[in-house]
Amino acid sequence: MDIAIHHPWIRRPFFPFHSPSRLFDQFFGEHLLESDLFPASTSLSPFYFRPPSFLRAPSWIDTGLSEMRLEKDRFSVNLDVKHFSPEELKVKVLGDVIEVHGKHEERQDEHGFISREFHRKYRIPADVDPLTITSSLSSDGVLTVNGPRRQASGPERTIPITREEKPAVTAAPKK
């Protein structure tokens, strides 16, 4: 049995490209991809570079996952629901929570029979009025739920600083 021996100088922070395990190759919270079932790339070469995250597609595409964004002027949620028709989806607001529910009964696909159901809940930010929330379904099966954020109640203003002649902190009397 061969045992890989790594020199201590390779494990130092100056060499972040070398990882003795697959820990750094994992995308936590995401499902397994086909490439995860093949041997670890780090076992094939000690100088494996993990591709930067900006080269990967957003994690919610093709995974059934969602992406929640809070931008300067709006709040939005994108959710992959390509396996559901509009009639099989419900979006509702209960208090400060958006609930998305999807369900379809058993149907046949290329692998046999399948039924699906999911529930997702998203907290509405305090500066978004629940009455202004809308939803739409794109042709590629992405459900978008969004609402405008309230702007600050007035224009920005600079507050002048005044100088006082007395100290803010006075010494306590000695006993």
From Swiss-Prot:
UniProt modified residues of type N6-acetyllysine: K92, K166
Entry keyword set: Acetylation, Chaperone, Cytoplasm, Eye lens protein, Glycoprotein, Lysosome, Metal-binding, Methylation, Nucleus, Phosphoprotein, Secreted, Zinc
Modification N-acetylmethionine, positions: M1
Species this protein is from: Sus scrofa (Pig)
Record's protein name: Alpha-crystallin B chain
Glycosylation sites (chain numbering): S41, T170
Domain named sHSP: residues: 56-164
Function of the protein: May contribute to the transparency and refractive index of the lens. Has chaperone-like activity, preventing aggregation of various proteins under a wide range of stress conditions. In lens epithelial cells, stabilizes the ATP6V1A protein, preventing its degradation by the proteasome.
Chief place where the protein resides: cytoplasm
Domain of life: Eukaryota
Family note: Belongs to the small heat shock protein (HSP20) family.
UniProt cross-references to CDD domains, sorted A to Z: ACD_alphaB-crystallin_HspB5
Annotated positions of the Phosphoserine modification: S19, S45, S59
Pfam families: Crystallin, HSP20
Alphabetical list of SUPFAM superfamilies matching this protein: HSP20-like chaperones
GO cellular component: cytoplasm; extracellular region; lysosome; nucleus; protein-containing complex
Subcellular location: Cytoplasm; Nucleus; Secreted; Lysosome
